[in-house]
């Protein structure tokens, strides 16, 4: 064993060969090494020459351009084309090491700490990079907030999602300030009539039915009822029956209608006394000559059957002619506010288990929503609102003739039209449903609301059928504790991208 060569002798024979290798000659490997790439500065990028990572770079220092040596802006992605740089939201990275080079090191840690706090702030939501349309981007953002399953890393405040306009961005803040000031308002002062002016019902009566016992404080605070949601308030009834006297007639004017061509007055159901008509005729200061005035008692004026839009009801039929629709609508309808208040309303009404189930229904169509709206521009969204108003104008003519209780609502559940038969069936009149932000789920019982979200997720984005039926849909009446069992047939109207534009619900009562 002593004469055998050990391992050290074997290495001794090999090492001389390594010592003869020239270290100055690079050893070629099978895989070619890759050079590090750096973002060129604006000057080197303009000259199309190589640049280094440090700022200012050596080339700019030599040429005396160190003050202007900054990273060249990168080319925008296609989905960010047309969006100003000032409105783009700075990305939030989970890792400090992935911060942009142009951000200073001293404030990088502070901004990262603030962003981490924003992840725990309920007033911020996880958000995807902007769509081509602010309206579509805002609607997707609030949907992501509702289902609470977004894994993207951009965050913006909720109050910045409602609109691109400054006066709409702070709607929530203004509403909160107005609510605080409401306590100092003198309730003995006259009412502020913020409702439509073409109704005979006083604002006191309308808003007392809309908002309940706190109606005076809410109206006096000048809160926008179309941007802030207040649930409907059913009342107690000792007779346990609906009072259909709350239903106003179609002719809601306070004075009798007069048709000069036939020299005749039309009297509504509120004015049927002859002295009232004579006094109204004298006030009009009209010269009738030798003709005698005729009266049609309990006969509604033909003008009452003409469709008239209300421009103050932004979610409803706003205009009465197609020319007005195409000329006056110059901004898209924001579904974001409606989705936000719908989620707030559901949280107050249902438990956590029901909310998770409803959020799961909303999460099913979120990827389809992204695919359909990512390429839509602001002009596309304006065109969709024009289509909605134009379609609703035509449907209103048909709905007025069929005599079936019908309610029309948007994809966020916001009611935008009801006919007289639906008012009679449910007991809610048009002013109560359209004079504020009202959701279709507000007038449904709990089981019907659960079925509503399942049906909506089924037909809205997955099964592109034009109709669906809810076998049982129990409507809540203005009388607390009383419901009307119905069968509801849905008819869906879609826009050019396949998204649900409006839903028409025909309600037929189930007679036991």
From Swiss-Prot:
Q: Which CDD domains match?
A: PAS
Q: What is its main location?
A: nucleus
Q: Which residues form the PAS domain?
A: 391-463
Q: Which UniProt keywords apply?
A: Activator, DNA-binding, Gluconeogenesis, Metal-binding, Nucleus, Transcription, Transcription regulation, Zinc
Q: Does the keyword Transmembrane apply?
A: no
**N-terminal signal peptide:** none
Q: Where in the cell is it found?
A: Nucleus
**Disulfide-linked positions:** none
Quote the cellular component terms of the Gene Ontology held in the record: nucleus
Q: Name one GO molecular function term.
A: DNA-binding transcription factor activity, RNA polymerase II-specific
DNA-binding region, residues:
41-69
Entry annotated with the keyword DNA-binding? yes
What does the entry give for GO biological process?
A: cellular response to starvation; gluconeogenesis
Bias (Polar residues) occurs at 97-106
The segment annotated Disordered runs over 95-118
Q: Which Gene3D superfamilies match?
A: PAS domain
- The chain's coiled-coil residues are none
State the function annotated in the UniProt record. Transcription factor which regulates nonfermentable carbon utilization. Activator of gluconeogenetic genes.
Matching NCBIfam families: sensory_box
Q: Which family does it belong to?
A: Belongs to the ERT1/acuK family.
Protein known as: Transcription activator of gluconeogenesis
